[in-house]
Amino acid sequence: MDNIEQDVKVLRKVLNGPLFLDKYPLISRVWVEEYGTNRIDIILNVKDPYSEYTPLRDEIKSYIYNLAKMLGVTTRFIIYP
């Protein structure tokens, strides 16, 4: 298994688990997809109203980056929205 495949597997499992979804209940699901050979896309499914997500967006992204660092994820990734 390639490093990017392992990173996708780990991120998918953790970001769709209670550690993340219980902390941020306004996110209902997270898609983690390999994009090409050198990047991962992370797509957050935000529950309505979206306006509740906007003030927490930077905090959530920072939490994901820190969590990925602790998990040893080395592949570059982008978080949407």
What are these regions (language model features)?
Residues 1-10:
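N-terminal presequence-like segments and adjacent domain-start helices
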Residues 7, 23, 52, 78-79:
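Long, terminal "pre-/pro-" and other extracytoplasmic accessory regions
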Residues 11-15:
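Short, aromatic-enriched amphipathic alpha-helices that serve as compact interaction elements
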Residues 16-27, 68-73:
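Short secondary-structure junctions
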Residues 21-45:
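Short edge beta-strands and adjacent turn/loop segments
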Residues 40-59:
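A short interface-forming secondary-structure element
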Residues 58-66:
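Low-complexity, intrinsically disordered Gly/Pro/Thr-rich segments
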Residues 65-81:
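A short amphipathic beta-strand at an alpha->beta junction
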